[in-house]
Regions:
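N-terminal beta1-alpha1 cap of cysteine-dependent amidohydrolase-like domains
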Residues: 1-86
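Amide-donor transfer/coupling interface in amidating biosynthetic enzymes
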Residues: 1-12, 128-170
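Residue-level signal for functionally critical sites in structured catalytic/ligand-binding pockets
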Residues: 15-16, 22-26, 42, 66-67, ...
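Surface-exposed loop/turn and secondary-structure junction residues enriched for glycine/proline
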Residues: 23-28, 33, 60, 104-107, ...
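Generic structural hydrophobic/aromatic packing signal, biased to beta-strands
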Residues: 30, 40, 60-62, 104, ...
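Short, charged/polar low-complexity linear motifs in solvent-exposed/disordered segments
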Residues: 37-39, 114, 164-165
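Cysteine-nucleophile active-site neighborhood
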Residues: 67-145
Length: 170
């Protein structure tokens, strides 16, 4: 008798704007690695994120985006800040690539020192600079975020039965 397995469920947030470096191809690759035994939920900017009401999502994924798109996504996610914090506190795997992580900080500072208020979950801010990047921390919780990202990579590779020989966060 074959044991029934449930599909892995991945929510991809805002694929219409969060695909700056073609990162959605990684989701397609993952789907093939899992022999299509995965359910992909693509949440557009016009939709309520599935993570708001569903507790069975295995991974929340968002890729990098343009600076203008960051501002749109911040407005979209701010109403769900408490829910995001709740899920992260419960060790919900969340994979944010590129500048998507900046959205969860306190603010994003432009080159002219003007600030864009971000979702505000973590005590760090990002600084936009044409010729360099980046993140500055003014609180200890940023370390917890990075540790959680590393843990998430390890958990994903173990869950998928991949041999994790090293993880690079760029």
């Amino acid at each position: 008798m074959r044991k029934e397995t449930s599909k892995m469920k991945i929510e991809v947030l805002f694929p219409e704007v969060a695909n700056l470096y073609g990162d959605l191809s990684n989701i397609e690759y993952l789907k093939k690695c899992l022999n299509n035994d995965v359910e992909i939920i693509e949440t557009s900017l016009n939709d309520e994120p599935a993570f708001v009401k569903q507790d069975d999502i295995n991974l929340i994924f968002m890729a990098g985006m343009t600076e203008k798109s960051q501002e749109i996504v911040i407005k979209k996610l701010k109403p769900y800040a408490d829910r995001i914090d709740e899920l992260v506190s419960k060790n919900q795997p969340v994979l944010l690539l590129g500048n998507a992580m900046e959205i969860l900080g306190k603010f994003i500072e432009n080159e002219d020192e003007s600030q864009i208020r971000a979702v505000g979950l973590y005590h760090f801010y990002a600084h936009r600079d044409m010729f360099g990047l980046f993140g500055y921390t003014n609180g200890a919780r940023i370390n917890k975020v990075y540790v959680r990202i590393w843990w998430t990579f390890a958990q994903i590779t173990q869950t998928l039965n991949f041999n994790n020989i090293g993880t690079v966060i760029g």
